[in-house]
Amino acid sequence: GAYYSYLIKMPDGTRVPPHFHGMTENVNVISGTLLVGIGDTMNVSKMTPLTAGAIVSIPAGLHHYAMSKGATVIEVSGLGPDTLTPVH
């Protein structure tokens, strides 16, 4: 597939419900804090904070979710086409 990259600006408290992708997704936290979790149900108490400079690679098919803490900007990249499938 072709390489893609895009920025997402997330206001404080933005929630991204459980979902998965057909391809590996790379996330680079540009500013703010992104809370991330793995599983089929969003559980804020089990989320891991990623701060500016953190880079994670999320394997294809892994059920995950996220939430911003404060205004947050992330860069998402990978080899497309990117697909997003909700868990529920």
Where are these regions (language model features)?
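Extracytoplasmic
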Residues: Y3-S5, G22-T24, G61, K69
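Short acidic-glycine-tyrosine-enriched beta hairpin
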Residues: P11, L34, D40-G61
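Double-stranded beta-helix
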Residues: S45, Y65-H88
